[in-house]
Amino acid sequence: MKPDFSTESLTGVWRTTVEHFMASPEGQNLVDRISSCTADVFPPHPFRALEETPFEQVRAVIFGQDPYHTPGKACGLAFSVPAGEKLPPSLKNIFKVMAASNEIRRTRGDLSDWAAAGGLLLNTILTGGAGKTL
C-alpha cells in the first residue's frame, strides 16, 4: 500500500503550503523515494491531521515522532489509532497523565474528536513502513 499524497482535501494555508512543498525538488524527491519503496507505507492519508484541523481552527498542537510501525495502527493523526484497535503504550501513558492530573478518563484510541476541537495531532515524520520510518 502506498500513501495518497493528493492535496485535494486540504484547504487554505495547509493546501498552499503543502502544494508549494510538493512542487519543490525536495518534495518530489520525497514522493519518488516513497513511491519506489517496495514495502507497504502508511498511513494511507499522511495529511489527515491537516485535513481534520484546518489552520484557522488550530487551538493546540500535539507533536508525535512518527506513525505507529504496526500495520492498521497508523491513521494520520499523531497518537491516535482507528476505532477498535488496542491502545498503544504511548497513548496509554497520555491517558494515565490525563486521569491523574485532570481526572479525565478515556479508553478509546480514536482521537478524531480532539482534531475536530482544534487539536492538531501532527507527527514530525508523516509516513512509515513496517518497523521503520520513511
Regions found by a protein language model. Name each.
Residues M1-E19:
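Generic N-terminal amphipathic, Lys/Arg-enriched alpha-helix
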